[in-house]
């Protein structure tokens, strides 16, 4: 049994296919909606911590009272060998918790753009396609934390995915995307889209929804490896 706690920062960035994966295996999943109430789980409440995305910065501790304690919780979860998954902002929070710098990227990356696996082997990404196309929605990036293994990059973002050991994974991109979650993100954050070379317009993003189907088996594989549970394990 894998008890999963999800830290959700805004209404329109839910755990999406991560929640579907957990439900399919009978794993209890509890969502802590920090935008409503700044209540964090204790370490004893979960086996896996999933940190979702959001429009804020991992550097916004002074503005967001819950962010500093959240970063501390992530650091403690890693130190106590919990399974930790960070998506988009969540990956940046993991990086910051591990002492890496989070900062503005060279350009926004919004829409469906390919990422490339980096050279070298790692159990979490072994066997995945050399290139696949997830959803991106970010303007910031981060340095690779000390001791982390770089797993993927894109044309304009050098750190798209990283792992620390086999139980901590940061994904700058949205491998968890579903049609519902993409539509929710567009409804909540389409105003962030400009006209940069790596900013797709809403119609283009909606036209790429079939990528969600392509991503799901990749996500399932990665989550099974991250948690140590195969498809049949409960």
Residues covered by each model-derived region:
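Hydrophobic/aromatic beta-strand patches that form the interior of the parallel beta-sheet core
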Residues: 5, 30-32, 50, 85, ...
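Glycine-rich, phosphate-binding/catalytic loops in enzymes
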Residues: 21-24, 65-69, 102-103, 153, ...
């Amino acid at each position: 049994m894998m008890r999963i706690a999800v830290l959700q920062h805004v209404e329109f960035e839910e755990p999406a296919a991560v929640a579907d994966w957990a439900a399919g295996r009978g794993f209890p999943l509890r969502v802590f909606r920090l935008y409503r109430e700044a209540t964090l789980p204790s370490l004893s409440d979960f086996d896996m911590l999933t940190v979702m995305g959001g429009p804020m910065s991992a550097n916004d501790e002074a503005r967001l009272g819950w962010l500093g304690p959240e970063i501390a919780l992530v650091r403690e979860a890693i130190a106590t060998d919990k399974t930790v998954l960070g998506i988009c902002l969540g990956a940046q929070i993991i990086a910051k918790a591990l002492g890496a710098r989070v900062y503005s990227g060279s350009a926004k990356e919004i829409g469906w753009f390919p990422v490339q696996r980096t050279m070298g082997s790692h159990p979490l990404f072994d066997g995945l396609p050399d290139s696949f196309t997830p959803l991106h929605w970010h303007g910031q990036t981060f340095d690779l934390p000390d001791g982390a293994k770089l797993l993927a990059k894109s044309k304009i973002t050098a750190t798209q995915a990283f792992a620390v050991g086999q139980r901590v994974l940061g994904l700058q991109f949205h491998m968890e995307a579903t049609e519902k979650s993409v539509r929710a993100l567009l409804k909540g954050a389409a105003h962030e889209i400009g006209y940069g070379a790596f900013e797709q317009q809403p119609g283009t993003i909606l036209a790429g929804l079939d990528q969600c189907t392509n991503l799901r088996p990749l996500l399932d594989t990665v989550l099974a490896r991250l948690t140590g549970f195969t498809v049949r394990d409960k």
